[in-house]
């Protein structure tokens, strides 16, 4: 097995990817549009590119299904259906999955380590975001470390608001983190942290920031 990149390097790459997405979109649209107007995959592609530059870069998969991720992370590859049924998980896509990079002997020996949800134009706590956090918690939660190869999950986002908004960016950020914290706290053997959130102000226009909410097991 190859050496997997350390968590902080991955998080920094995610933030750098979103920063690069913002620079590119602003330049490409000649300062006419903000990043929040970009299509959903815009963040994903830029983040994947930055992670791909890391030393010991992992295998990177865009829009992998939850069933495939579980198949590549549970001890028994055939247990994913029972796991999903037991935890009330509907199959759908996750933005990015990072797998161990090695020479494969078959098309069924991948090992998933990190899962990510990337959201653009985040301004308030939405059910969609809370559902992503809940699902990722269920995928990470376990009684023993060896019950899954998944190490952590990242919910990364770009937030921007106009200067006329009722709530400022810091209030919105605090509400988002508080909401996510309550979900993580309802699951055993999990902890969370937040990186980013440095709010940038644009005079007479508004505020923006980039955040990475990280969930990991404590075993």
Report residues per predicted region.
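Charged, often low-complexity linker/regulatory segments
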Residues: 1-52
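Hydrophobic, Leu/Ile/Phe/Ala-enriched alpha-helical segments that form helix-helix packing faces
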Residues: 17-25, 47-55, 136-144, 173-188
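Active-site metal-binding core of divalent-cation-utilizing nuclease and nuclease-like domains
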Residues: 35, 59-108, 200-204
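Alpha-helix termini
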Residues: 55, 101-108, 140-148
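Conserved catalytic cores of phosphodiester-cleaving nucleases, focusing on short active-site segments
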Residues: 96-100, 111-122, 136
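Active-site-adjacent loop/helix micro-motif of nuclease/hydrolase catalytic cores
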Residues: 107, 123-135
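Domain-level recognition of nuclease-like catalytic cores that cleave nucleotide substrates
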Residues: 141, 147-219
